[in-house]
A protein has these predicted regions:
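Charge-enriched amphipathic alpha-helical scaffolds
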Residues: 69-84
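Extended, domain-scale alpha-helical bundle/helix-rich regions
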Residues: 56, 62-66
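Conserved A3 ("GATE") glycine/threonine-rich loop of ANL adenylate-forming enzymes
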Residues: 243-246, 289-293
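ATP-dependent carboxylate activation and anion-phosphoryl transfer catalytic cores
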Residues: 1-37, 41-57, 80-81, 85, ...
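ATP-binding N-terminal substructure of ATP-dependent carboxylate-amine bond-forming enzymes
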Residues: 76-79, 88-257, 266-273, 491-632
Length: 634
């Protein structure tokens, strides 16, 4: 619509096309006219005009784009004219009587209220600002809001006034009683800066917590550092060191820790050069993004150009990262807390799926189910080394890959991770509360950390929105797709995994017809899988190649056609409700194989059939089925 107005399309014409009330169209036109004017004459020179522009809703960043000035210059000119936002309380009492709820929003509109202009009223207490996670989306979910809330409760108990900054009404952190004061504002530089300056007008601002809300507030760490605003916990220098590939590689070399060969590219030409040097397979991803957005595994050179271009788009002005992909490796997630001298390794989680599946989508087990004890000990040692070398204060998350008993560091995030609530529940420890107190200056030793649930297995399983999007593809990869998670808890791993599947609305069958389609490289391992299925009273069916291989090893197996081989095919059989379990690691790069695999995955989704896309998940499912058949579910 604004584009139409810029092209001089009349309001009457837009109304006829859109049916939007002309009053709203007039408001949009006012904004468009302001944009045109700003491009022509630049920033207003007087208070009245500048304040009018701000009251319409133009951010400093947008003004900088329209006037070809830096955002810093725009901010300084605005402050020089004493154009600052005022904060108003949300009227939680519907004007029936005076509202005292400290639930603030900013405005540049003035002289429209009989109450005092600014209602923020910063107190004289010692205070801590917590930056929330902003809007929920894939990769940035309620797990981070949990951390922010727990930090607020804990710091209040420790005698600090807590101030929450967030803009998502669907979160607990924006409840009126979670913090002492809430600013319902975007997690953007201008808005956060204004809030900090307002709170610094009275009392003692101890610091700003940026590491609990995920990647959104962490992106503000550089801005806070540049403006000499106090960051609580891990400092920007450490955050930047962990994100800067060249410097981080040097640190790993110094610590004698292994990492897959990698490079960082600022241009397309650099990316191609690095890719040629490292060789396939590769992991291509943008820096400073969450949820694995635009992250891809490149197996063929023909895929490279498109994936690099998409990574640069997602990275915006940041470089992209290119790593050698460690194929067929086991991935491990570690959460830890450090006070700068001591390090507590809170949880070592083994991913059920192989490396290459985003950590937010992979099921995982705490404690690990098949990692050798000496490797667990070495992971603990490497975690402690990295925490101390990075001068971490508060949370740290590390992702490792293990292949042939060698440990590789994938990445380090000096912030809270999405697994913190899971580890806290599994260990029976309020980790976010402890980390916030450590960031405020307390020592780890004070908390006498001892887990309360030894001898138990906790399994985290991702929950996906595929049932709401029937044409979506179930195949998982490095870009996150899940929108939630559940947890299974038991003394037995198989039962814990079974419980996690029940909680994720993916209940496993105890018998029936299993359908198997395997890559050639998985067929030897698949024979053991087939034998286990028969022992569990399943009958076998498979695609022609897999079925013939199973028959060679003395087992009965029904052949079912792929979709491209003609009817009746696997989708027909799934639609007839005759399949109880699908294990499909097959696929390929030819068009008909890709289409076959997509059709199979969509049919399993439509018919609510449990579906395994890799051997490790299939093995975990068999463990769970064994437990369901031999143990009582409680």
């Amino acid at each position: 619509m604004p584009r139409g107005l810029l092209k001089k399309i009349s309001l009457d014409r837009i109304f006829k096309l859109s049916k939007i009330d002309p009053w709203f169209l007039g408001q949009i036109k006012e904004i468009v006219d302001c944009e045109i004017n700003l491009k022509k004459i630049g920033l207003p020179k007087n208070f009245t005009e500048f304040n009018r522009i701000k009251s319409i809703g133009f951010s400093d960043k947008k003004l900088s784009e329209l006037t070809n000035l830096s955002e810093d210059v725009v901010r300084k000119k605005r402050i020089a004219l004493k154009i600052l936002p005022v904060y108003k309380k949300v009227d939680t009492c519907a004007a029936e009587f005076k509202s005292f709820t400290p639930y603030m929003y900013s405005t540049y509109q003035r002289n429209f209220s009989i109450v005092s202009e600014c209602e923020a009223e910063p107190t004289s207490k010692k205070k801590i600002i917590i930056l929330g996670g902003g809007p929920n989306r894939i990769g940035q979910g309620i797990e981070f809001d949990y951390c922010c809330c727990q930090a607020s409760f804990s710091l209040k108990d420790a005698g600090f006034e807590t101030i929450m900054v967030n803009c998502n009404p669907e979160t607990v952190s924006t409840d009126y009683d979670t913090s002492d004061r809430l600013y319902f504002e975007p997690l953007k530089e201008e808005f956060v800066f204004n809030i900090i300056k307002k709170e610094q007008m009275n009392g003692n601002l101890i610091g700003i917590i940026a590491q609990f809300g995920g990647q959104t507030p962490i992106k503000l760490a550089k801005f806070l550092h540049q403006n000499k605003l106090p960051i609580l916990g891990t400092q920007y220098s450490s955050i930047d060191l962990a994100e800067d590939r060249d410097r981080f590689r040097n640190l790993l070399n110094k610590l004698k820790l292994k990492q897959a060969e990698s490079g960082i590219a600022k241009t397309y030409k650099e990316a191609i050069k690095i890719a040629d040097k490292i060789g396939l397979p590769l992991m291509v991803r943008p820096s400073y993004v969450l949820g694995g957005r635009a992250m891809e595994i490149v197996y063929e050179k023909g895929q490279l150009r498109n994936f690099i271009e998409e990574a640069f788009k997602a990275a915006e002005k940041n470089p992209i990262l290119i790593d050698k992909f460690i194929d067929h490796a086991m991935e491990v997630d570690v959460d830890a807390i450090s006070d700068g001298k001591e390090v507590y390794v809170a949880g070592i989680m083994q991913h059920i799926e192989e490396a290459g599946i985003h950590s937010g989508d992979s099921a995982c087990s705490l404690p690990p189910i098949s990692i050798k004890p000496f490797l667990v000990k070495e992971i603990e040692n490497q975690t402690k080394k990295l925490a101390l070398a990075l001068k971490v204060k508060g949370f740290m998350n590390i992702q490792f890959a293990i292949k042939k008993d060698e440990i590789y560091v994938i990445e380090v995030n000096p912030r809270a991770s999405r697994t913190v609530p899971f580890v806290s529940k599994a260990k029976g420890l309020p980790l976010a509360k402890i980390a916030s107190r450590v960031m405020a200056g307390e020592k780890l030793l004070k908390f006498n950390l001892k887990e309360k649930s030894k001898g138990m297995y906790a399994v985290k399983e991702a929950v996906f929105p595929f049932n709401k999007f029937p044409n979506s593809d179930l195949l998982l990869g490095p870009e996150m797709k899940s929108t939630g998670e559940v947890m299974g808890f038991d003394k037995n791993f198989g039962m814990a995994f079974a419980k996690s599947q029940i909680a994720a609305a993916n209940s496993l069958p105890k018998n029936g017809l299993a359908f198997i389609s395997l890559k050639n490289s998985h067929k030897d391992e698949g024979i053991g899988l087939a034998k286990d299925l028969i022992k569990l009273n399943f009958k076998l069916s498979a695609t022609k190649g897999t079925a013939e291989y199973i028959r060679k090893h003395g087992m009965k197996c029904k052949i079912i056609n792929k979709v491209s081989s003609g009817t009746p095919h696997i989708v027909d059989v799934l639609d007839s409700k005759k399949i109880a379990l699908v294990i499909n690691t097959g696929g390929g790069n030819s068009e008909h194989r890709i289409n076959d695999a997509i059709a199979l995955r969509r049919a399993t989704l439509k018919n609510k059939v449990p579906y395994c896309t890799n051997m490790s998940t299939a093995q975990a499912c068999l463990e769970a089925i064994k437990s369901l058949k031999t143990k009582k579910l409680d």
